[in-house]
C-alpha cells in the first residue's frame, strides 16, 4: 500500500498552472520536522517534501493556501524521471488535504508578510477538510465548462471547531467561495 501522511508548513506560495489538456494543478513544498535519533541530543531535522494537487483541489489551494500555512496532507508517493538531468524525483500526489489553522491566523500572517501588523487575539481553530477523491469524482475533468462553474458548486469540505483541547461536536458544510474570499 502506497500511503503518505504528513503535517507541516508550506515553504512558499504554491505554484499554480494548467496542463496543455486544461487540467489545473498546484505544486508546493511542505517543511516537516523529524527527530534525529542518531546524534547524542534529540535534534529536529527538517525535511522538505514536494507535493502536487490536481483539478478542484488545486483551485481550492490557489485561493486559500499561502506561505507558512499549517497543513495536513494524505496521498501517495510517486516517482518520475526529470528530463533535464535524468534523475529520479519523488513527490506526494495529494488525495486528502486539511488546513490546520484558522482563517484569522492565515490572514494575520499574510498581513505581516505584506508589512502590515495586525493585533493578535484569541481564536477558534478551524480544521478545513477537503477530500480530493470526492472532488475528483464529482467533476468531469475533461470539460473546461465544469471547471469554470466550480465556484457555483457546494464544497464537500467539513469544518470542526476546536477550543483549546475540547472538540465541538458540530460539523458544518462550507461554501469555499463565500467563506474564504
From Swiss-Prot:
Keywords: DNA-binding. Residues 142-152 have a biased composition (Low complexity). It comes from the Bacteria. InterPro entries: NA-bd_OB-fold (IPR012340), Primosome_PriB/ssb (IPR000424), ssDNA-bd (IPR011344). Residues 1-101 form the SSB domain. GO terms for molecular function: single-stranded DNA binding. NCBIfam families: ssb. This is Single-stranded DNA-binding protein. It comes from Mycoplasmopsis pulmonis (strain UAB CTIP) (Mycoplasma pulmonis). The gene is ssb.
